[in-house]
Amino acid sequence: WEIAQESIRENKYLRAEKALLTILRVDEKNATAYNRLGILYAKQRAYKDAIECFEIAQSLEPSASSLHNVGLIYYETENYEKASLAFEQALEMEDDLAARYIAYAKVQEKIGNTKKVINALEKAVELEPIPQTLKILAEAYDNAGQTELAEELRKKATKMLTPTTSSKKADAPRPRQQRKIHQPRKIVM
C-alpha cells in the first residue's frame, strides 16, 4: 500500500498501477484501491478506465467521494448530464462540502441551468463564506443579470481581504509600560 501511495505522490504511475493491481489481486473488494486506481488513471487522462474504477469502488462501498470523482471525470469528458447526476448523488450522501456544490454549479452552468447554478453556489457560500466562493457566486449573479447582488458580494469579499483600520489598531504592538525596578529584598538569616 505504501509503495502505491509513494509512487502516486512521485508521479511514478506504472509502479503505482502495478502496486494497486497487486493489492486488488489479493483483495478484489478493496474499494479504496479501486478509488486510488481511478485517480491514477484520471491523472493519465485514461478517463474510461478511471470511470470504471470509480464505479466499481462505488458498487463495493458507496461513498460521496467516489461519486464526486466520477462526476469530475464526466465533467472533464463533457458528459454533463452524467456529471450532474453523479454530483447530485454525492450531495445526497454528503452535503457539507462547498467544493461539491461548486463542482455541481460548474456542471449546471455548462447545461444552462442558471437557477441551479445560483442555488448551488449560494449553498457553497453558506458553507464556506470565503472571498473565493463569494467571487464565484458574484460572477454567477452577473451572468444572471443580477449585477447589484454581484457588486454587493464583491465588496464583501474585498472587505474580507482588506483589514479594517480598527483591526489594524488591535494588531499593532502595544508599547510596554515602564516597570519600576525594585531593589531585591534583603534576606535576613
Give a label for each model feature:
Residues 33, 66-67, 100, 133-134, ...:
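TPR alpha-solenoid repeat register
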Residues 28, 61-62, 95, 128-129, ...:
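Short coil turns that delineate tetratricopeptide repeat
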Residues 9-10, 43-44, 76-77, 110, ...:
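Register position in tetratricopeptide repeats
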Residues 1-32, 36-39, 43:
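Alpha-helical segment of the N-proximal tetratricopeptide repeat
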